[in-house]
Amino acid sequence: IDEIIPISFRNHFYASTGRTRKYPLHAFLWALIIQRIFSIPTDQLLLTFLAYSKSLREFCGFTKVPDASKITRFKQDFLDDLQLVFDNLVDVTEPICQAIDSAKADMTIFDSSGIEAFVTENNPKYANRIIKQLKAYAKAQGFDKSYDPYKAAYGSMPSHASANPEIKQLYINGHFCYVFKFGIVTNGLGIIRHISFYNKNFMASHPDIVVEKKSDSPDEDKCVHDSKLLIPTLKDFFSKHPLINPKTFLGDAAFDTAQLYKSLLTGDTFGNDKHFSKAYIPLNARSGLENLDYSINEDGIPCCPHDPSLQMKYEGTSKLHSGVTRYKFVCPRMKWIYDKSTQKSHRHCFCDNPCTSSKCGRMVYIYPEKDLRAYPGTIRGTEKWDDTYKIRTVVERDINHIKDNLCLAGRRTQNEKTLHADLILAGITQLITVVLADKINRHEYIRSIKPLIA
């Protein structure tokens, strides 16, 4: 573990001023990492294990078990140093990820979630009481079935916890909660590459983010907020790790906005001519695609002018001499006919109601750079799209993993620094798993440390 601790962390911990440290730096780090490896839910239970296990104390480097306050103070006082440890591990694990699967390592996936704080508003009875009152009110007033008490409850609940205005209301996994919001960037292997904690410091460093008042739709609010956080989060990621240069972005429909496609796929958004080549983002159902000459389906594929339900066939991608990429689509009724006399094949359209006089049938050329939203460097609705987009779920599994298995959920505190440190420690634990799996050549366990230590 000494190899991953920056010298600045050591200098800060063993400062020349102040009292002499009774407990070594590596002992605190090992104890907190082991807590997450074995999914020990509370710091107090960790200290109990240390008190009754001499071998565990010796492994960590403790000669005496510290108080619970020492653990808390360590997290709060050395939060920035823990962030440095995490950032160092990201750089250490990048070559490992590239060696395992370079295609997936070149993917960037983003999602956001929240750490539920220990506040009154997170008691299930709090939301249930409001919903019950609204249902009774709707019944008394004779409202019809279009009235949604859950949306009404969302609108009537406060936007932040009374104990701390930084603990914001959020709608996660089908329930209302009050959380410290964070964002996670992973690669296609599901290995965490970046963590952003959306507190006052983050907002101050990105003044271009405008926080709007909440609407009546919790899902819509989360989508709008996530789309505003994406580019600032990725800019922070690439500025910390300039040698990491992924080419493919995967995200959900919350990021389906014309401006985001332009930022992701063109220009100097993340550095000098540094941007993604492809963006796998499904179209938002609320806003489709339009074209005057022919209809376009929900995947951005042109359809027959006479039959919108009949999509044209994708025939390939080509590059012009100018370097411009174009996609070619042909009539779905077209077939290749072999001529024995010339020993060549030619196209022939067998449509009963042709939309063109050409014997080959209608052909459509799409230039992606003219409409990045419709054609973000790839074609929706194809087998390749479906296979690639499935990978996006690794970020959701990662979030569930760090919450359930790496001791992020159920923390009985509302202190921002403590919960932020817990989040970073969860990321550190996962990256140490990658290093350990690589050392013993068991890459199948890069996201599962328990089988490695069993």
Each model region followed by its residue ranges:
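Basic, amphipathic alpha-helical segments enriched in Lys/Arg and hydrophobic/aromatic residues
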Residues: 387-454
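Major-groove recognition helix of helix-turn-helix-like DNA-binding domains
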Residues: 60-79
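DNA-recognition alpha helix
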Residues: 43-60, 91-94
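Polybasic low-complexity intrinsically disordered regions
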Residues: 73, 77-249, 253, 258-266, ...
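Long, low-complexity, polar/charged, intrinsically disordered or flexibly structured peripheral segments
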Residues: 163, 327-381
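An internal, acidic/charged active-site-proximal segment
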Residues: 219-220, 226-339
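Short amphipathic alpha-helical "interface-anchor" segments enriched in bulky aromatics
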Residues: 50-51, 114, 293-330, 368-416
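Basic, short loop/linker segments at the boundary and entry of helix-turn-helix/winged-helix-like folds
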Residues: 1-34, 38
